Curated annotation (Swiss-Prot):
Chain positions found as Cysteine methyl ester: 237
Chief location of this protein within or outside the cell: membrane
UniProt protein name: Ras-related protein Rab-33A
Tissue specificity note: Expressed only in lymphoid cell lines.
Family (UniProt): Belongs to the small GTPase superfamily. Rab family.
């Protein structure tokens, strides 16, 4: 079973402006507030973006999928250290003709990014540079957490992208690398780890922002992520 591969890149706290946009869903009642973390999944068509979101949000692999047109999103409520958090996963189209009208919308107020490639298609890996450029070109703060995911690892005989090459790329772009399969039920825990890793980091960053804001009497400053913060969360990465 393929395991997540952790690169030397670290997930750093998002910018103060980005963190300030983390939303609260208070529609249930005045006593219950659920934070919403918006995570977008981007990459070439047919790399398995939709299947990854189905596996995480519903625990299933769809029998049949069609090319995503524009953007779609799925949600899953998770509990981290006693707090319920809604993880909103935005599944984006990989084809240019479906992206033009929606691209600004799904990059708006993003909290974390998942870049996906197909380990059996080298072109999907080489195109990652294009996706990163698009992300940067839409003013996504450079400190927004990002991870790299190599999907379809169940097709072991067809792998074209070696792990060491992917790890080198992830390190160069300050990302963690996960290799997994949305199709293989045995890999479901690894798919879960991708999104839970980001959710844990975002939760920790937001908590730090609140404490800093209180100390500064409402004045928000950029935060340095403390080394011990990782041990205080149930973060899988």
């Amino acid at each position: 079973m393929a395991q997540p591969i952790l690169g030397h890149g670290s997930l750093q706290p998002a910018s103060a402006a980005g963190l300030a946009s983390l939303e609260l869903d208070s529609s249930l009642d005045q006593y219950v507030q659920i934070r919403i973390f918006k995570i977008i999944v981007i990459g070439d068509s047919n790399v398995g973006k939709t299947c990854l979101t189905f596996r995480f949000c519903g625990g299933t692999f769809p029998d049949k999928t069609e090319a995503t047109i524009g953007v779609d999103f799925r949600e899953k409520t998770v509990e981290i250290e006693g707090e319920k958090i809604k993880v909103q996963v935005w599944d984006t189209a990989g084809q240019e003709r479906f992206r033009k009208s929606m691209v600004e919308h799904y990059y708006r107020n993003v909290h974390a990014v998942v870049f996906v490639y197909d380990v059996t298609k080298m072109t999907s890996f080489t195109n990652l540079k294009m996706w990163i450029q698009e992300c940067n070109g839409h003013a996504v703060p450079p400190l927004v957490p990002k991870v790299l995911v190599g999907n379809k690892c169940d097709l072991r005989e067809q792998i074209q992208v070696p792990s060491n090459l992917a790890l080198k790329f992830a390190d160069a772009h300050n990302m963690l690398l996960f290799e997994t399969s949305a199709k293989d039920p045995k890999e479901s825990q690894n798919v879960e780890s991708i999104f839970m890793c980001l959710a844990c980091r975002l939760k920790a960053q937001k908590s730090l922002l609140y404490r800093d804001a209180e100390r500064q009497q409402g004045k928000v400053q950029k935060l340095e992520f403390p080394q011990e913060a990782n041990s205080k969360t149930s973060c899988p990465c």
